[in-house]
């Protein structure tokens, strides 16, 4: 009986670890403002999570500017619905000039994410949420001037000050050497992303990136 109870508690912990959500100026991971959605159909069982199997994520209710974080193969995966103004900023020469690898020359993404938005569809960013310096988890800071005057939105790693834009491209003069990795993923339909599976005809493994 005690064993059954412990197993149930462990499974619940795994499900709670699977998905959380933050919006607007709410920082992710490490604040008391994290909101836990009650979306059972999006939470796989513990065995699925542990196996690292492909993971289907419903993005139908993901509002513009909102981020969700899911857990795949033990890694936090950032999924963000980038609004039109954020996409314009990604192409702004004033921002591009501040980035270390604006054209994604380093192999930190699959071929189908080798573009200015580093994604299959411009609106949706899908990134491994691990700082390429020492493995901390950056916080989502999407709003202009939210982090500091002149900030245009992106992620900030509080461990050592590394910064990334809303495409996961790393800024110059920070400790992190590479852009945030893009995991293998594809769209099942307009409202569902499958993480861990490439589009038809594409080949990419997360282990092939330079820095995870």
Regions found by a protein language model. Name each.
Residues 12, 17, 21, 29-71, ...:
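C-terminal segment of N-terminal export signals and the immediately downstream linker at the start
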Residues 2-5, 36-37, 41-54, 60, ...:
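Conserved C-terminal region and hinge/linker of Rieske [2Fe-2S] proteins, especially
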């Amino acid at each position: 009986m005690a064993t059954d109870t412990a197993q149930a508690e462990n499974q619940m912990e795994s499900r709670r670890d699977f998905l959380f959500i933050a919006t607007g100026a709410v920082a992710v991971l490490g604040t008391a403002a994290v909101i836990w959605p009650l979306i059972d159909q999006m939470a796989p069982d513990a065995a699925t999570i542990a196996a690292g199997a492909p993971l289907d994520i419903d993005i139908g209710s993901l509002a513009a500017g909102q981020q969700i974080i899911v857990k795949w193969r033990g890694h936090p995966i950032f999924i963000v619905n980038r609004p039109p103004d954020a996409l314009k900023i990604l192409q702004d020469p004033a921002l591009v000039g501040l980035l270390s690898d604006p054209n994604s020359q380093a192999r930190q993404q699959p071929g189908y994410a080798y573009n200015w938005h580093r994604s299959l569809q411009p609106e949706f960013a899908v990134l491994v949420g691990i700082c390429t310096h020492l493995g901390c988890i950056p916080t989502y800071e999407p709003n202009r001037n939210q982090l500091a005057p002149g900030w245009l939105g992106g992620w900030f790693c509080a461990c050592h000050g590394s910064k990334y834009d809303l495409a996961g491209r790393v800024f110059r003069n920070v400790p992190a050497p590479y852009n945030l990795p893009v995991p293998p993923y594809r769209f099942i339909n307009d409202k569902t992303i499958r993480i861990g599976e490439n589009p038809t005809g594409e080949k990419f493994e997360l282990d092939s990136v330079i820095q995870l």
